[in-house]
Amino acid sequence: MKTLITGGTGFVGSHVCRQQMAAGHAVRLLVRDIEKASAYYRRLGEGIPELVIGDVTDSASVKTALEDCDSVVHAAAGTPMQTGSTERLFRVNVDGVKHVVASALERSIDRIVCISSITAIFNSDGAKVTATAPLTQSSLPYGQSKVEAEVYLRALQAQGAPISIVYPGGVIGPDDPGFSDSFKALKHRMENGFRIFGDGGMQYIDVRDLAAFVCSLVQSGGSGRFLMPGVYCTWSELADIIETVSGCQLQRIPAQGWKLRLVGRMTDLLRHVRTIDSPISAETMRYATLWPNIANTGELPTRGLALRSANDTFADAIAWMVEVGHLDASQCPKLSVRD
């Protein structure tokens, strides 16, 4: 089997690539910078996938990349912080999905897996967040882009297209080729104070568990929607976990949700006039203060998979951050650099 992966130099896509190669499958990545991608996989020492130059916003390069592939994982996506503009955000998250999926269907590829986001079906009532839940009509650009892509994918699914959609929560774990927003937020909390949003919480999925589930979907094919929000922790529980696994003594800051949502909106306004490298935004504050406990797909045990504990995930994530220099070792006395 040969799998095309978009976003293969991103956090999720790189782990899917590594697991597919470890299982003996051929992998091709659509990348914007071949030298950068090659250097990353060379450092891992696990083999270098086939690399082709292109971008998901360019349909011609997508069509070329899909030649002789029999499966595709679309993991390329953008966030407001990464893309820098709403226009670019929609080009990546909406046009990119359309280019990849339409081109795959034109080639009669019958194993198509798309990584979406829980935000597309977000509801502060967790019981209402299911695989059949209606789409959320977000007033925020990121949510709007994910919903627009979902409308397209669901219409194709209704016509019988072989598309599997996966909805992860916050993705965390070791070995990020870049420095994703989840890590920026974690670093900020460890160094600048950990805000406790009342009784709220968040769900985190270990990137390795998410990749394993995606690879299982590539193997099985078919069509469906699968929730993978991960392990739920209240903010107080998460602070306890971070202190337990790292030895870092966090400064815990009680915070009211409505105030944080206001700060998020103000930060977004400031981004129109200056560059702000911060995980704070209207969208992130909404999710941080209103996130419920959402059930994971029931497919995990039938596929022989189980989620890691939050302790294991954050221990490995923080150890990796120390290893690559995102955190100083003195901040995490219980952790040593991984072998």
Positions of predicted regions on the chain:
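Short-chain dehydrogenase/reductase
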Residues: 90-94, 138-150, 170, 183, ...
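Conserved catalytic-site region of short-chain dehydrogenase/reductase
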Residues: 81, 118-127, 171-180
